[in-house]
A protein has these predicted regions:
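N-terminal secretory/targeting leader peptides
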Residues: 2, 8-120, 130, 138-332
């Protein structure tokens, strides 16, 4: 039987035959090649962080491990990626919290609106004991949580100007496919509409919906500002994303070198810091561009924001069993 090393050596000789590689020469490339799934395009902050992760792994393992990043959803949609990771079909991935919460309901609490007062509080929570507890819980899914990525803060944008909670009454607003998001819209006095993301522009243009919600980069990239030029900076949701490894991949790494799993965890944390920096730059750039284009931005006063928070408070009743956790988050 031909060994995997022999097959790789033969492949290397085929490619490098022109420079005199002979069949007796030993293959000197990586000993382990792992796959990383990312559904965003290559210039997106999360994909750039995945590429940084791959570079760090190659450097820290002295070339013994190679991580190949497949961007643009090449390895499938996030739900499929999560399932493939559970049996080791994919080794690493960046996935959204909302998708992972479908398999690990305990994570849903992190999607509650107005859970954090600002970004620094969120990172104190996720980079601290609470975040580590959530990452450890992924072991039940045969996954290893490496780090938390930034996915920005979501706000509303509309066809007509909205300044207060009362102005939202009766409006039809597009939200993600999520029971929690739909409930939030209802509690705010509006009507939720689940429109396919690629159709949101047309739905706004044709007045099928009155508004939608998302972060600054997405608002800019999809051109929604052209048909919904009023941005209500309410910052109702800060929902992070996760960088994961499959347990199967970590076992392979440990077999190769007992130091490698810890190296992977370190690379995961370092690449997450890079992603957050890249995201902050992109978010600031998008907001600046939108303001310059002429988008009218309304920032909620402290009093008005308190009204928004109070309106969605009933949603927290469904998380009574995690009330102590919510208190810990709010006190962080």
């Amino acid at each position: 039987m031909i060994s995997r090393r022999s097959v790789l050596a033969l492949a290397a000789c085929t490619v490098l035959g022109a420079v005199g590689c002979s069949k007796t020469e030993e293959y000197t490339g990586p000993e382990l090649i792992l796959r990383y799934a990312e559904n965003q395009p290559e210039d997106y902050p999360t994909t750039q962080a995945a590429l940084a992760f791959a570079d760090l792994v190659a450097e820290r393992t002295e070339g013994r491990v190679k991580v190949v990043v497949y961007s643009g959803g090449e390895l499938g949609a996030e739900q499929s990626v999560i399932e493939q990771m559970q049996y080791g079909g994919i080794d690493f991935a960046r996935v959204s919290l909302s998708q992972l919460a479908e398999y690990q309901p305990a994570l849903s609490v992190l999607q509650l609106p107005f859970l954090y007062t600002d970004a620094p509080q969120m990172w104190r929570v996720l980079d601290g004991e609470i975040g580590d507890e959530f990452l450890s819980g992924l072991g039940a899914m045969d996954l290893v949580g490496l780090s938390w990525f930034d996915a920005g803060v979501r706000s509303f944008y509309t066809r007509e100007k909205v300044e207060t909670l009362a102005d939202l009454a009766g409006l039809t607003l597009r939200v993600q496919e999520s029971d929690m998001m739909s409930e939030m819209i209802l509690d705010l006095g509006a009507k939720p509409a689940q429109v396919v993301y690629s159709r949101v522009y047309a739905a706004l243009h044709n007045a099928e919906i009155d508004g939608a919600e998302n972060n600054w980069p997405s608002y800019e990239a999809m051109g929604h500002y052209e048909v919904a030029p009023y941005f209500l900076k309410d910052e109702h949701a800060r929902v992070p994303e996760l960088q994961l490894a499959s347990e199967a991949a970590m076992e392979k790494l440990a077999e190769l070198d007992e130091r490698f799993p810890d190296i992977i965890r370190t690379c995961g944390k370092e690449s997450a810091l890079a992603e957050r920096r890249l995201w902050a730059e992109r978010e600031a750039s998008a907001e600046k561009h939108m303001r310059e284009w002429g988008v009218e931005v309304t920032t909620l006063s402290a009093v008005e924001k308190a009204r928004f928070r109070a309106a969605v408070e009933p949603m927290y009743a469904a998380f009574e069993e995690q009330s102590r956790l919510i208190q810990r988050i709010r006190e962080a």
